[in-house]
Amino acid sequence: MTGEVRRKKILQMLQSQPEPMSGTALAKEFHVSRQVIVQDIALMRAENHGILSTNKGYIYRSDAVRDERPKRVFYVRHNTEQVLEEFLTITELGGTVLDVAVEHELYGQIRVDMLIESVQDARDFSEKLSACKDNPLKVLTDDCHYHTVSAPSEKLLDLIEAELRDKGLLL
């Protein structure tokens, strides 16, 4: 199978899957290494296919490039134990955590898609973080980081901002 054919099949699989698919699962499906899948995804994203890479795997979002919901970037600082509190604050008010970013002195901005859309997503991420040996990106910048958050309205973004501020999470 050529790379082009494989990429078309990967895209079809992701478009038909409502849940994220891991790079490992895709690699097994197509009998290639995970690195080949990572390269295929990078090529498809360069062609503006709406593929997001989240902590749960790859997901196709037809609205990923054209998400028209209001967005706001929040600059926050908290310890690892407060990650769940932060995400619950956002999701319980109807927000979605689209990504996390840090400003690294050497590498510049490092940004990772998250797509935390619900209370359950927040809890799942928190459990995964607790079980994981790796540290979150925020440890690179003394716990300071950015989240792009979308919500159905500017009013909800205002409420999210106020709640994050009241909880001492917003810088």
Model-found features: residue ranges?
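Residue-level marker of alpha-helix boundaries and capping positions
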Residues: 1, 14, 31, 77-78, ...
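Conserved active-site and cofactor/substrate-binding residues in soluble primary-metabolism enzymes
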Residues: 5, 21, 32, 53, ...
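Solvent-exposed alpha-helical segments within well-ordered globular domains of core cellular machineries
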Residues: 8, 12, 28, 39-42, ...
